[in-house]
């Protein structure tokens, strides 16, 4: 059995780390499309094509269930994939819904009509493509009413993180938070809508202030995945080996990933 985890680069490792801790008995195959990262500046058709190609590669590794641990892919490609492309014996899941369920205090799989929730003013920090897709607002509307979402495209943050430039990443985060707060001075909650951003969570929190609740995705996705596999064990695939695949240079990606997770990670060429 194996589950696939896909990201355009290294950000999905934050999700992988959480799901491995939650489900230590499950092998995970991680696919990073580092050669084409970042996705956040690409158009929807390009993101769709790249995400489909990566998903097929994970299916070939015996992963019948693939987690898109990439908000840009979840926002720009997932709905189209589910409507027209994914075969009936496979599943591809995104990372938005567990986050929204936590924000709206709904149980996993609660499909009751949308209702009023306590949080009325939400700041969304995401890549330009995720912001342009309005996928977060669309998913939120299925579950809650009366919530004002102010979205801030965070250009450059993913590139800085992928390049290991923490000083630049912190400066960019502060700049983007300042830009959002000019439009929404008092958000109650902030969504880190990119799986790279948990690495900058302390910077986001400091810039936003202690009164703002910051929601990060990794642990929420891990809990949701555990629940999903308990309900749908038939989608645990036939793969038996955990591995890391990349379209980039395996040595370079391995070194960055090792710094990222602070444990030795070895990528193979996809």
UniProtKB/Swiss-Prot annotation:
Name the enzyme group at the top EC level: isomerase
Q: Which Gene3D superfamilies match?
A: 3.40.50.1860
Active site annotated at which positions? 70 (proton donor/acceptor), 194 (proton donor/acceptor)
Q: Where does substrate bind?
A: 7-8, 39-40, 71-72, 195-196
Protease recorded as keyword: no
> What terms describe the molecular function in GO for this protein?
glutamate racemase activity
Pathway it acts in? Cell wall biogenesis; peptidoglycan biosynthesis
Secretion signal span: none
Give an example GO biological process: regulation of cell shape
Question: Which residue pairs form cystines in this protein?
Answer: none
Q: Does the keyword Cell wall biogenesis/degradation apply?
A: yes
Alphabetized, the UniProt keywords read: Cell shape, Cell wall biogenesis/degradation, Isomerase, Peptidoglycan synthesis
Catalyzes what?
L-glutamate = D-glutamate
What is this enzyme's EC? 5.1.1.3
The family line of this record is: Belongs to the aspartate/glutamate racemases family.
| Biological function | Provides the (R)-glutamate required for cell wall biosynthesis.
Name it. Answer: Glutamate racemase
């Amino acid at each position: 059995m194996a589950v696939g985890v896909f990201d355009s680069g290294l950000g999905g490792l934050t999700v992988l780390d959480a799901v491995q801790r939650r489900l230590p008995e499950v092998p995970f195959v991680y696919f990073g499309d580092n050669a084409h990262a970042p996705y956040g500046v690409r158009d929807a058709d390009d993101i769709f094509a790249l995400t489909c190609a990566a998903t097929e590669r994970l299916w070939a590794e015996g992963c019948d269930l693939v987690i898109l641990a990439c908000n840009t892919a979840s926002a720009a490609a997932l709905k189209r994939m589910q409507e027209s492309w994914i075969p009936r014996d496979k599943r591809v899941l995104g990372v938005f819904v567990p986050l929204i369920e936590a924000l709206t205090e709904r149980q996993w799989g609660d499909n009751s009509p949308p209702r009023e929730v306590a949080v009325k003013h939400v700041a969304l920090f995401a890549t330009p493509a995720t912001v342009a897709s309005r996928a977060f607002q669309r998913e939120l509307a299925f579950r809650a009413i009366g919530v004002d979402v102010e979205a801030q495209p965070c250009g450059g943050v993913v590139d800085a993180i992928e390049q290991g430039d923490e000083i630049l990443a912190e400066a960019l985060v502060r700049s983007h938070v300042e830009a959002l707060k000019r439009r929404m001075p008092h958000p109650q909650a902030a969504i880190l809508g990119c799986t790279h951003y948990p690495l900058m969570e302390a910077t986001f929190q400091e810039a936003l202030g202690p009164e703002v609740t910051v929601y990060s995705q990794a642990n929420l996705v891990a809990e949701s995945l555990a629940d999903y596999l308990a309900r749908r064990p038939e989608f645990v695939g036939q793969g038996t080996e955990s591995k890391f695949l990349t379209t980039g240079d395996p040595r370079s990606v391995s070194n960055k990933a090792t710094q990222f997770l602070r444990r030795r990670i070895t990528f193979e060429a996809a």
